[in-house]
Amino acid sequence: MAAAEALGAARYFTRWYKADVKGRPCEDFCVLQHSNRICVITLAEAHPLLQPGKTITSINYQISPNCSRLQNKVSGKSKRGAQFLTELAPLCRIASSDGEEYTIYSFIRGRLIEVNENILSNPALLQEKPSTEGYIAVVLPKFEESKSVTQGLLTPEEYKEVLLKRQNSSSGS
């Protein structure tokens, strides 16, 4: 499946946000939920990696010595072979030129359908087109959990409020 092609049809996606993942300020993620329940994990606009002056130096899907998201081999209608992810499962690690490293988490329970290998050779896609060709991964929630997958996530309007509060608290100090 070419997720980047599917992303072109934005009208089929509902945008949800998760702010301050694992208590890390501004490390926000976005999930684009398709009408067929597939979820595309992306960086949210306020994520530090998307701020001016940041340069991505490397992206690593090797999570531990025995776990690489690149080894995820999916086949068939039931997506056999897909790695199962919990909400806190790391998808990849991204390093920037200022020495910072960011762990990107799934925050969606389900099967890992695809990781975006294009960003390995062209990391700038993450910053230039974070909601389309610069996506991180595609996750398929369990059918029975597909309705509850967005519990605890923010709508675009709620996320804007979070960003406004951050802006007001930083300008007030």
From Swiss-Prot:
Any Pfam family hit: GCV_H
GO MF annotation: an example: actin filament binding
Gene Ontology CC entries for this record: dendrite; filopodium tip; growth cone; lamellipodium; nuclear speck; nucleus
One annotated GO biological process: regulation of actin filament polymerization
Location(s) in or outside the cell: Nucleus speckle; Cell projection, Lamellipodium; Nucleus; Cell projection, Growth cone
Keyword Ubl conjugation carried by entry: no
Family matches, as InterPro entries: Abitram, GCV_H/Fam206, Single_hybrid_motif
Keywords from the named record: Actin-binding, Cell projection, Nucleus
Keyword Nucleus among record annotations: yes
Family note: Belongs to the ABITRAM family.
Role, per record: Actin-binding protein that regulates actin polymerization, filopodia dynamics and increases the branching of proximal dendrites of developing neurons.
PANTHER family, per database record: PROTEIN ABITRAM
Protein name: Protein Abitram
Source organism (scientific name): Gallus gallus
Lineage, highest ranks first: Eukaryota, Metazoa, Chordata, Craniata, Vertebrata
